[in-house]
Amino acid sequence: AEAYAAVPRIGRRTRLGPKQRESAWAVFAFVRERLSTRGVVTTADIYGRLTRWVEDGGQLPFTHVVVDEAQDLSVAQARFLAAVGRAGTADALFFTGDLGQRIFHLPFSWAKLGLDVRGRAQVLKVCYRTSHQIRRAADRLLAGEIADQDGIEESRRGTVSVFDGPDPVVELFDDASLETVGVGKW
């Protein structure tokens, strides 16, 4: 509980006070106990076990890893990949990702977990998956410069798409059934 209370929480929007952290820890402890009683583990637990196995000299059945959509990695997955990278050659890991597409996890420092890509990252400026119209609409919603927790910045300026499509339509509906009808008409 004390270790949990002392962990810095970079990127969190609302900070928890000591009493709130204590309450949260009680919930986590309860869930952990329930999982243990049922013989169930979380995905994070699996990655933690794999990380320890690699760090203890476990022999990997591969020499290189390519990670797509790297912006969606969890902390446990990033720790595992850092262990894989330390166990392999200098070029054992290759990541592709888009900071502007991070939607699943709160930001965290890759460098603090052992994945320091500063100075070795390349920003690609040609988009093959999204039309000009959708990309421009999305760019209006994002800041011109996006930075991660390690200070790596990615500029949206100069990015181009290779095809056109219809303009995105934004509509508001009063309820889910009207939204379903609206989507069906599209």
What role is predicted for each listed range?
Residues Q20, A26-V40, T51-W186:
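Conserved helicase motor core of SF1/SF2 NTP-dependent helicases
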Residues A1-Q20:
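ATP-hydrolysis module of ASCE/P-loop NTPase motor domains
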Residues E2-P8, V40-G48:
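Short coil/turn segments at secondary-structure boundaries
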